[in-house]
Each structure stands twice: as structure tokens, then as C-alpha cells.
Amino acid sequence: MIKFDGFSIPDNQRLIASVMVLKAASAKAKAALLSGDLTHFRTWFDGTGKNAHLMKVSSIVKEIDDAIRSRPITFANATGNAIERKEQGLCGYVWLMRNPGVGDQFSKMIHVGSGMRILIVPGTHGGNINNLAETMYHELSHKVGGTKDITYDVNTCKRNALLTPQQAALNAENYNRFLGEYIN
């Protein structure tokens, strides 16, 4: 169940449309990976052809899709709060907890609990529902996959897929760019 908190009626309408885009594109992305179509995986996660992080990326993509379909998610308006004022151009953010246990780089910061709260700044999307859907996916990759913000630059994301696939698989921006390939 997806809810919205603190948005205007026009913003709510854009968010509802963005969630529809998010659901459709997420299902396509998951289906592509599960069927073995690695075209966009190679662009955004591993251009070496070794597919070293295919299982990890596929797991995160599946977990994001599962969360979209079955977990309580609240998108809350972060417009005007202290973090949004400090971080000019902020699109969204989430809060994670440090994992005290042993784990890999993906499990150092984790989401706990069944519900998720994701803060969104709708004004930075300029009314573009596809861009907003990609931001939602980006933030969900943090929540369910433990991804990090290594780079937002599109060319660096692609270069990491070619030269350092581990960085690409860990970077949240690569996930929303991957999702963008499935938005029509």
C-alpha cells in the first residue's frame, strides 16, 4: 500500500501518476533480468560481460519490485525542511540504520521494519512524472538494497559499469537509470 503525506492536490496527482509509471517499469525491469535479457544490465551495471554482480543486482531489483507491490510505503513531502534547504536541488532521501553485524558493502546500512518512509521534494522534478518515478526507485534502492550515492553523473555511472562494476552495482543512481530504460 502506497500513501502520500503532506503534498498538495496537484502534487498528489503527479505522485499517483509517478507510482503507476514506477510499478509498470519496475515489473518490466524485473522481468527482463529474470528472463535473461541483460541488455540494460550491461549498460548500467556490468559492461565487462563478466556479469559479476548479476545476482546482487537482480536481488535488489526483485526486492524493490516486491516492496512496491506488497509493503507499506509512505512518500512524504520534504519541501522546505532543513535538509532540503541545506542540499540545493535535493530530489529525495531516506533514513537508514547502521547494521552492527557482519556483512558486505551492501548491508552496512539497512532499513528495518515493514513500512518505509521516503522523503521527496516534488519541485525538483519540474512536473516530470517519469523523473519522479526514477527518484522513487533510487530511494527504494537505498531502503531495500543498501545502495549508496557514489555519483549522480550519467557518464560516470556508465563508466563505472565498464571499469568498476562493483561501484555501479552499489550506486543508487545506476538503479534509477536502469529503471529509466523500461519507462515508455
Explain the meaning of each model-derived region:
Residues M1-A133, K143-N184:
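Predominantly extracellular/secreted Zn2+-dependent metalloproteases
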Residues E139:
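Walker B catalytic acidic pair
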